[in-house]
Amino acid sequence: MLVFHDPLRQTDLPRGCVATIGNFDGMHVGHQQIVRGVVERARELGRPSAVITFHPHPLTVVAPDRVPKQILTLAQKEELLRDMGVDAMLVVPFSHEFSRWTADRFIEEFLVGALQVQEVRIGRDFCFGAGREGNLQKLTAAGERHGFGVMGIEDVKIRGMRVSSSIVRDALSKGCLRIVTLFLGRTFFVDGRVATGRRLGRKMGFPTVNVDPSNELYPEGGVFVTTCRFESFDRSFESVTNIGVRPTLYENYARTIEAHILDFDSN
């Protein structure tokens, strides 16, 4: 998969692509339905498939007091899209300047001018452009003028609930991992670096791995059955992970992620 980190300025873009547009935070089952449809349609037409997303989250610029914590890092989003067979990920830098682009300008200059899109698929409630003026209706009208197809994708519902990133965020922060797993369609994961701790667990006979997480959002606290993977090993390890205050070190109230790896004695 090709990744373009400044597609508004780059010229070697996947022209004639079948594309989708969105933030895709969490890459939940609703997002996956859209992306799979894009990949399948692109293969039918012999065209490249492309996911157009924004970084940082648009609210970081237009309403920083309302920006939500992100479920995925940009690198995690890239990994998931690559695994789904997407040909190109276009990461539009969301700046104050870009926030003033009208929906018409985005369509005319980027989708039509730069990408020459063959087809665009979006969620039915997706909005874009300054003031969120762009929507499915506007995009459909532009497609009729410029000759590209547009499809609005219905929401996915599970147990009568509309799948959304906001519900996943709420469930994740509360540690409701059954809902998180159901809505994500996969196990939630955290990336990070192993941090040097105080080694007190090792001295007491149950060494732990302290994780400095890359993720902004993860359960606020609890003990979880987990699996750990390390870049230096070609296998996974069963583990028990505590998130929150170190349970035996009450003088230190820093929030931590500590994993006790079962049957593991390496450093």
Show which residues each predicted segment covers:
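A glycine-rich helix N-cap at a beta->alpha junction
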Residues: 73-90
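Phosphate/ribose-recognition catalytic cores of enzymes acting on nucleotide-derived substrates
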Residues: 197-267
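Glycine-rich, highly charged phosphate/nucleotide-binding loops
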Residues: 69-77, 101-107
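N-terminal catalytic cores of NTP/NDP-binding nucleotidyl/phosphoryl-transfer enzymes
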Residues: 10-73
